[in-house]
C-alpha cells in the first residue's frame, strides 16, 4: 500500500519531467556514440579564414583556390567528427555554423570564377557533401538543424557568399567564444549601413528580417529585436521597408 501511495505521489513530477523532455527538440543534429569524441577546435578553418578573408568579409577566392587541399583537410575533419550528444550546445552550434560556411566556400571554389552563387544550379538544395554517414545540403543545415536550435543570431553568422549576406567572419566559431562571437556578429550586421538603413521613424532593412521574421519575433516584434543591437533607437511604429538583396559574389 505504501508503495502505491509513493508512486501516486511521484506522478506529477514524472509528468512534468516528460513534458520538459518533449519540449526539447530532438538532437537530429547530434549522434549517440559510446566512444564519444571531443568537439573539434576548428583551428584549421580559422587559419584559412585569417589568410583569405578580410576584416570586412571580402573573400579572396582566387587565393583560396590555391589552398583547396588545406580546405579539404578541414572538411575531412568535419566529416570524421560529427557532433555528439555529449557535446555542449555551443560546440554543436559552432560545428554547424562552420560547416555551413566552409562548404559554401568549397561550393564557390568548385565553380570559380563566377559572379554570383546563384549562377550555380540549385546551390542550397542539392546534397553535395557527407558528414558522418549522412548526406547534407546547405538548405538542410540552415533550416533543419541551425534554425531548429532556436538561436536567431545564426542568421548573422552563416554566409551565403553574397554582398547582402552577413559578412563571412575571418575567425572560426568556437565553443568557448561562441556567445561573444554571435553577439558581435548581430551588432555588426544590424549597424552595417550597407545592409540596413536605420532612423528613429523609418527603417529599410535586410530581407533576412522578412524571410525569417518568425525567428526574430519569439520575444516581441522585429523592431524590438533590432533595438537590442541598433545604435539608433527605433520607434515601435517606425515605417518598415526591405532592401533589395544583392547576390553579387562577396569577393
Segments (PLM) and residue ranges:
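Bacterial Sec-dependent N-terminal signal peptides
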Residues: 1-27
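Interaction/scaffold regions that mediate signaling and macromolecular assembly across diverse proteins
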Residues: 20-97, 101-251
Amino acid at each position: 500500500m505504501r508503495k502505491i501511495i509513493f508512486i501516486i505521489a511521484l506522478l506529477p513530477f514524472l509528468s512534468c519531467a516528460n513534458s520538459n523532455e518533449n519540449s526539447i527538440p530532438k538532437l537530429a543534429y547530434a549522434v549517440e556514440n559510446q566512444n564519444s569524441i571531443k568537439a573539434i577546435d576548428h583551428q584549421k578553418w580559422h587559419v584559412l579564414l585569417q589568410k583569405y578573408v578580410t576584416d570586412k568579409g571580402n573573400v579572396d577566392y582566387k587565393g583560396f583556390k590555391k589552398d583547396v587541399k588545406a580546405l579539404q583537410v578541414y572538411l575531412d575533419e568535419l566529416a570524421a567528427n560529427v557532433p555528439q550528444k555529449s557535446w555542449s550546445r555551443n560546440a554543436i552550434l559552432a560545428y554547424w555554423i562552420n560547416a555551413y560556411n566552409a562548404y559554401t566556400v568549397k561550393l564557390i571554389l568548385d565553380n570559380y570564377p563566377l559572379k554570383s552563387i546563384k549562377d550555380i544550379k540549385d546551390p542550397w538544395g542539392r546534397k553535395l557533401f557527407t558528414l558522418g554517414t549522412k548526406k547534407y545540403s546547405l538548405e538542410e543545415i540552415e533550416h533543419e538543424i541551425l534554425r531548429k536550435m532556436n538561436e536567431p543570431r545564426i542568421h548573422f553568422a552563416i554566409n551565403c557568399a553574397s554582398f547582402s549576406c552577413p559578412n563571412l567572419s575571418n575567425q572560426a566559431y568556437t565553443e568557448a567564444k561562441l556567445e561573444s562571437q554571435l553577439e558581435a556578429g548581430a551588432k555588426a550586421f544590424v549597424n552595417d549601413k550597407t545592409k540596413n538603413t536605420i532612423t528613429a521613424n523609418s527603417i529599410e532593412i535586410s530581407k533576412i528580417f522578412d524571410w525569417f521574421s518568425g525567428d526574430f519575433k519569439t520575444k516581441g516584434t522585429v523592431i524590438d529585436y533590432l533595438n537590442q543591437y541598433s545604435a539608433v533607437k527605433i520607434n515601435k511604429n517606425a515605417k518598415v521597408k526591405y532592401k533589395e538583396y544583392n547576390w553579387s559574389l562577396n569577393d
